[in-house]
Amino acid sequence: SYNPANNRWYGADGKAINTILGEARPGMVKLVDQTGEGEVNAEDRVVLGNTQADVQGGFGLNFHIGGEKWGKFDLSAQFTYSVGNEVLNLSALDYGTIFDKSKLRNNTADVAYGSRYSLFRADGGFVPADYVGSDGKVSGDGYAAMVAALAVYNANATTANPISDNIALTDKYVEDASFLRLSALTIGYTLPEKWMKKAYIKTARIFFSGSNLFCVTPYTGADPEVDTRTKINPLATGVDFSAFPKSRAFNFGINLSF
């Protein structure tokens, strides 16, 4: 049931429902009762992931083609990879949670109205208020009708109700951070020597190089290789809280030998 007088939700036993996420309400994330004791508490905590990769390393490619007549092309590429490591995306947790509905800030699109489960209609009306009975509460048939109405209003919702009183780390924000990154690429062209003789140049090579040109990863954050700094533990690994991604660089140049 729901009591609008104190804005609290109650279970079938008449007791207020509270979880480690704070006061419960329809549409909230449901946590698994690992111990089976009928209550979700600190005893239900489990290991959510591993920041250490199962396999990591790198490999390179080198390619040369051409001759003295038309010049020589060269290409080198260096790749790095990691498989099996996981990252806690605290940025997604922070920007995907609303701690005070009157203080929305920098929230992600998946918790926008129409995408998140909400107790409010599009016109701003509070749905439970439409089903308050003569006893001043939403209960019995009124509660069932409210649940049905909420199901209609939230038919297209793709994420749970993000309004929460507390933060709880769940596997929703633990992501696979495996990746394949093109760490470095160089493409060069060495001009034929016969073209350079008149300029008294022995060899001339034009090149382009770049670093961190692309990264293939299922991770939804800015970069799976995060550098973490937290107030609690500055040495923590595998935690992304608005960490800067690796920079990308481009270079053009020419090598001359006289």
What function would you assign to each model-found segment?
Residues 1-258:
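Outer/extracellular conduits and scaffolds centered on Gram-negative outer-membrane beta-barrels
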